[in-house]
Amino acid sequence: MKNIFRKRTPLFLCTLFLCIFLPAILLCSHCFDRALFHKITSAYVQSSLEHDALSLHFVMAYPNLQGIHLKDAALPVYSKEASEASAASRQKFLSVLSFLDSKKLNEEERYTYDLLCDRLALDLEESDFSYYEEPLSPTSGMQSELLLLFAEYPFYTADDVETYLSLLQSVPDYVQGLLSYESEKSAAGLFMEKEDAKKSAQQCREILTKETLSSGTHFLQTTFSSRLASLLQKGLLTDKQQSQYEAQNQSLLSKSVLPAWQLLADGLEQLSDTGRTRGGLSQKPDGRQYYAWLVKESTGSSLSMDQLYLLLQKQFQKTYKEMKQTLTTYQELTGGTPDLAPVNDGFPLSDPTAILEDLQNRMQQDFPALADLTAQTVQC
């Protein structure tokens, strides 16, 4: 009996230990994963924004309160090495996240976990298309977008003005990075079409000119003055500071930003004849795959292109039926038809040129021809 008791005593003690301490151990395990997850996400946000003062300011008005401190108040400058380092950093974050047990996170944390993993994986896929991105597109390129972002840059304190001026000062380096990227893109045989390069270069020369800066009417001058006036009115700026900032802004626009934009225009024109493909992405080696990646990146959907196409077709058919039903209901209620083109089972025109001509004829009542308007010069 004593031997049996001695044999069962260790087993009993182990069972008792597990009953008492196992919940605490499991709780600590859950706490560890959750704490590590929060640490990883905080580090990811900080590493993503601390080198991009422009993006950071639009995301957070007071980043210091979130423990995020700028490494340098400058625009991020492209280099092949920096791009590779960024991809390596994303891979590192994804690898660390894979060690976590997402089941130990709460519902909100699991949702963030899934989103972050998908985002990092998607960003890493982009490295397969190194030179397919076009930052200088004539439709929405940085040659115009960056200046518009500067115009919308909010000033909450005088420190924001200092950061803004530092960003203007970094524009030449930023442009050099853009030209380096476009040169590498050209060497890879993926430079934009000649017509697009010419349009982008023309935009560089037109959106910022010596004449508008001399007259003080450029939008980067007028919006800057307006934002300073707002700070002055709130008592966050002195008259002396306002005058000093106005002078610095004028100097940087004339001596840094304008020459950089002229350099960008020259660089695009020099590379304009190096584009080897015409007809858009579909004609480039991995153009279709990059387009599929773009759709996934833009929509957040994991559906294939064929699946998305079918969804769109179903939606178009549903919308078309609803339009026909609305027209039928209108006719039943009023006995007439609205002043719109009749809805037929098939679109009356199929030739692209004929469709555009028909549209131009229909829009004349609401939008008169340019020749009928008085020519006026619009200053931004």
Give the role of each language-model region.
Residues 12, 23-380:
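N-terminal maturation segment of proteins
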Residues 2-19:
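N-terminal Sec-pathway targeting helices
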